[in-house]
């Protein structure tokens, strides 16, 4: 049986879907009316002299890799004097290498990030151009307000939204649920009942690849949000008026996670598996696990691995509510995610420290006109199952799972940005290590709360 499972996983993980190979000309033009009719654009006039843009991103596999490359190809075709030198690395490696590059003073001219605290620190360290005036002067897509807000800091626009909306929901195997006779849970108590029945039937409830650390944080974030809305996190972030990562909601969330660990709700070896390699999805494919709490970008990964398996088995539901907190008036529609997915920031400077405006102009045009044109957005939606952070696109979603994610996102009272992106970079590392310790039962919720408090206080004092 184990051999059959391994063979099936290899088949699924290596299977390439036809859609990933489609070129821009093969994708329908059903979204052409969103951006409006073609007309003269108000964009910077770019240099005709030879120029190189060093561009880093994290799209290492199709379909996203091809979408990025084709956007750059369209730009280079229109501006043949400008060469875009691209480097792509997987998420966790990318983050590490970007910090290394900045530490050595060799950061790329254009790079993606996840917004939040790290973006602010990149800016304060001198690796982000302030593009407020350009954003207010030149054409750009009609981004949703939340995306512009997330791309900004202290009244300054510091990045161009890229990648689209990303929610966080529970993906599940509908076939297993039907076999076991369980329904989609609406409350955390019901979720625990489902998990117990799955265990009795021989299935591990959740697949988790917490070697990436931020994956475990999703459970922590949602449990805190369901128990207290945004209030306790906001207070802990400010470290004022008694705010602390040891407050009631954080302790409750940590204890709940450790209780789930002890009950066997997660797969074996979860702290050593990585999500970049799809090791969490593999445990869904071989029927070891029944559910996975993850970002909505995984719809693309599921389809890319196997359209057939996805259509036959994959369902999605929002993180269940805390019934007791709801009775106390705590909002239950705070969702975890991001309004921009990623942002493009620019690092264009001359040797004397002044802004290299010609290169900055070129980066701005590439980011706003080629990574956000009709072709790019069509491919994002049809090939990558992404939801552009641009007004009007939410009505064009065809994939039912992504439509569900979008509905949850747009009906949220508030969208909490991932802790590992919202927190200052120094606190983020502490937080992620705390997730390893929490899920590993190495430290108590109180102990990791104290560690995060110390890190937050140090960051605020800088």
Q: Where are each of the predicted segments found?
A:
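Hinge/lid segment of periplasmic solute-binding proteins
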Residues: 39-45, 114-168, 183, 192, ...
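Short, well-ordered beta-strand elements
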Residues: 48-61, 82-87, 109-110, 158-159, ...
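Short, solvent-exposed loop/beta-turn-alpha elements that line the ligand-binding surface or hinge
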Residues: 44-46, 130-143, 183, 227-252, ...
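Extracytoplasmic/periplasmic solute-binding protein
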Residues: 154-162, 168, 192-242
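C-terminal capping/gating helix-and-loop segments adjacent to ligand/active sites or protein-protein/ligand interfaces
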Residues: 152, 381-389, 403-460
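Glycine-centered hinge/linker elements that transmit conformational signals in sensory
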Residues: 197, 239-272
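Extracytoplasmic "Venus flytrap"/periplasmic binding protein-like
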Residues: 74-152, 175-186, 282-283, 290-291, ...
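Extracytoplasmic/periplasmic substrate-recognition and gating elements
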Residues: 77, 83, 180, 263, ...
């Amino acid at each position: 049986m184990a051999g059959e499972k391994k063979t099936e996983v290899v088949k699924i993980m290596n299977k390439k879907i036809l859609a990933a190979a489609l070129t821009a000309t093969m994708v329908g033009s059903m979204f052409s009316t969103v951006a409006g009719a073609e007309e003269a654009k108000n964009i910077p006039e770019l240099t005709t002299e030879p120029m190189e843009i060093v561009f880093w991103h994290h799209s290492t596999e199709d379909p996203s890799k091809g979408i990025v490359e084709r956007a750059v190809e369209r730009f280079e075709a229109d501006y043949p004097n400008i060469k875009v030198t691209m480097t792509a690395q997987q998420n966790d490696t990318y983050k590490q290498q970007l910090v290394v590059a900045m530490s050595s003073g060799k950061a790329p001219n254009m790079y993606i990030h996840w917004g939040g605290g790290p973006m602010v620190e990149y800016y304060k360290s001198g690796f982000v151009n302030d593009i407020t005036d350009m954003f207010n002067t030149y054409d750009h897509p009609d981004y949703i307000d939340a995306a512009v807000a997330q791309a900004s800091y202290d009244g300054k626009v510091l990045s161009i939204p890229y990648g689209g909306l990303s929610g966080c929901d529970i993906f599940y195997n509908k076939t297993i649920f039907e076999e076991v006779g369980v329904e989609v849970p609406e409350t955390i108590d019901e979720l625990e009942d489902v998990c117990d029945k799955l265990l009795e039937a021989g299935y591990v409830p959740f697949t988790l690849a917490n070697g990436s650390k931020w994956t475990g944080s999703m459970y922590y974030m949602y449990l805190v949000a369901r128990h207290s809305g945004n209030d306790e996190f906001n207070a802990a972030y400010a470290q004022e008026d008694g705010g602390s990562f040891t407050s009631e909601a954080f302790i409750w969330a940590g204890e709940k996670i450790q209780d789930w660990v002890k009950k066997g709700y997660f797969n074996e070896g979860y702290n050593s598996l990585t999500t970049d390699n799809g090791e969490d999805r593999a445990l869904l494919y071989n029927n070891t696990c029944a559910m996975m709490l993850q970002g909505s970008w995984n719809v693309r990964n599921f389809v890319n691995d196997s359209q057939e398996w996805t259509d036959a088995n994959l369902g999605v539901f929002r993180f269940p509510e805390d019934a007791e907190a709801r009775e106390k008036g705590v909002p239950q529609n705070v969702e975890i995610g991001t309004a921009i997915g990623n942002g493009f920031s620019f690092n264009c400077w001359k040797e004397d420290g002044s802004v290299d405006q010609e290169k900055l102009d070129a980066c701005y045009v590439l980011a706003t006109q080629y990574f956000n044109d009709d072709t790019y957005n069509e491919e994002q939606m049809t090939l990558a199952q992404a939801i552009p952070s641009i007004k009007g696109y939410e009505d064009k979603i065809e994939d039912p799972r992504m439509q569900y994610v979008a509905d949850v996102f747009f009906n949220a009272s508030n969208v909490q940005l991932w802790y590992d992106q919202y927190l200052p970079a120094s606190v983020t590392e502490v937080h992620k290590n705390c997730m390893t310790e929490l899920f590993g039962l190495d430290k108590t919720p109180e102990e990791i709360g104290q560690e995060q408090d110390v890190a937050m206080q140090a960051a605020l004092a800088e």
